[in-house]
UniProtKB/Swiss-Prot annotation:
Protein name, UniProt field: Rho-related GTP-binding protein RhoH
Keywords: Cell membrane, Cytoplasm, GTP-binding, Lipoprotein, Membrane, Methylation, Nucleotide-binding, Phosphoprotein, Prenylation
Segment forming the signal sequence: none
Lineage of origin: Eukaryota, Metazoa, Chordata, Craniata, Vertebrata
Membrane-topology annotation of the record: Lipid-anchor
Organism (species): Bos taurus
Amino acid sequence: MLSSIKCVLVGDSAVGKTSLLVRFTSETFPEAYKPTVYENTGVDVLMDGIQISLGLWDTAGNDAFRSIRPLSYQQADVVLMCYSVANHNSFLNLKNKWIGEVRSNLPCTPVLVVATQTDQREVGPHRASCVNAIEGKRLAQDVRAKGYLECSALSNRGVQQVFECAVRTAVNQARRRNRRRFFSINECKIL
């Protein structure tokens, strides 16, 4: 079982990656938007009675930081590809930009697609044009993500589930990897 997990969040600028992290780690919501360049934090989480150190790496969505983003990918155990339901371009960019960047740096690391700012479907000025869950699930299948989740950092809906799923996905991937290693080392050969 992993004792520490590195979780990297990617996606366009202003889709709510930092707000999601702040809500999860401090149970508050940042009122002012502050663009991220590169930030990481950590929290201890319990999964099935086992304490795991969860490292959270927030990346800049701005293309100006494309050259330094790969530094945050090193040895990641799981990636959260985030888009805002109120920003259709951020949704399209998961398929047109982010999955390619993630797969070229982390070809075997599990990816989860995370729809953020779901509160905008109910109260936002863009509610009629918001990306719906069916479109999000289809995108997750298209990019071969391990899962699709929705959340709102503002209303604190689905936030905990996003990180529980990230931890469980990373742990399950490590178990599969260890099982493959065990069987490849201990193969029986009939001569």
